[in-house]
From Swiss-Prot:
It comes from Sorangium cellulosum (strain So ce56) (Polyangium cellulosum (strain So ce56)). GO terms for molecular function: ribosome binding; translation initiation factor activity. Keywords: Cytoplasm, Initiation factor, Protein biosynthesis. It is found in: Cytoplasm. Residues 193-203 have a biased composition (Basic and acidic residues). Residues 212-241 have a biased composition (Acidic residues). The lineage of its organism: Bacteria, Pseudomonadati, Myxococcota, Polyangia, Polyangiales. This is Translation initiation factor IF-3. The gene is infC. Coiled coil: none annotated. PROSITE patterns: IF3.
Length: 241
């Protein structure tokens, strides 16, 4: 059976998790996909078993001697880990700071997209830090960055307050905005209502309502899109230098 389609490079954005052929040690302790301890075996043999089931061989404890690996669906594993992280985040009710990067040359279309993203983050109860990075002679025209940040403030002032006004630090101009108290109250009420419904279901012996991950998924999607755009901007800037 051919190796599963998962591309190991997908794991590189987070902690380095070794899977499949990236597990280089000759011998490992293996846990089956059903949780059964299969004992110590040669890595190539464990990989063969994973392939036969159409699954991945994933290193779950690299510090053990020998390292512990588990046969599982890595795509599902990553999804479950994200879900656990979201759950922990909900319980902590921590206000995150989302960063949005700009350039003096950011065009109107991209500026509007990034402002909409900021509006979404602020509406979800997060603070937003805007950074405008200057390259080369761009630093001689800081007024362009100031205009961009003023435009952003104007379009977000309905739901957010300026926490730190635009300021220059070396070759970067920054602005920090925070959700207005009414927005934070609305977010807190929604979380409290969801938790109350969950606790009530548990007390009545019913299955707890599934958590609605739509908002978290939208936020994550926006962050990925912003990251991709930042990479494109960096490539373009390096090409023109």
């Amino acid at each position: 059976m051919a190796m599963r389609r998962f591309d190991p490079r997908q794991a590189q954005r987070g902690p380095q998790i070794r899977i499949n052929q990236r597990i280089r040690v000759p011998e490992i302790r293996v846990i089956g996909d059903d949780g059964e301890m299969l004992g110590i075996m040669q890595t190539h043999e464990a990989l063969r078993r994973a392939q036969e089931k159409g699954l991945d061989l994933v290193e779950v404890n690299p510090k053990a001697d020998p390292p512990v690996c588990k046969i599982l669906d890595f795509g599902k594993y990553k999804y479950d880990e994200k879900k656990k992280a979201r759950e922990a985040k909900r319980k902590q009710s921590v206000v995150e700071i989302k960063e949005i990067k700009l350039r003096p040359k950011t065009d109107d279309h991209d500026l509007e997209f990034k402002t909409r993203a900021a509006h979404r983050f602020l509406g979800a109860g997060h603070k937003v830090k805007f950074t405008v990075r200057f390259r080369g002679r761009e630093i001689t025209h800081p007024e362009k960055a100031q205009e961009q940040l003023d435009w952003i403030v104007q379009h977000c002032e309905e739901i957010a307050n300026v926490e730190v006004r635009p300021m220059m630090e070396q070759r970067t101009m920054t602005l920090m905005m925070a959700p207005k108290p009414a927005i934070l109250q609305k977010v807190a009420q929604a979380r409290a209502a969801a938790e109350k419904a969950r606790q009530k279901a548990i007390q009545e012996g019913r299955a707890a309502p599934a958590q609605d991950d739509t908002e978290d998924e939208e936020i994550e999607k926006l962050e990925r899109e912003l990251e991709e755009q930042d990479d494109e901007d960096d490539d373009e800037a390096e090409a023109t230098e």
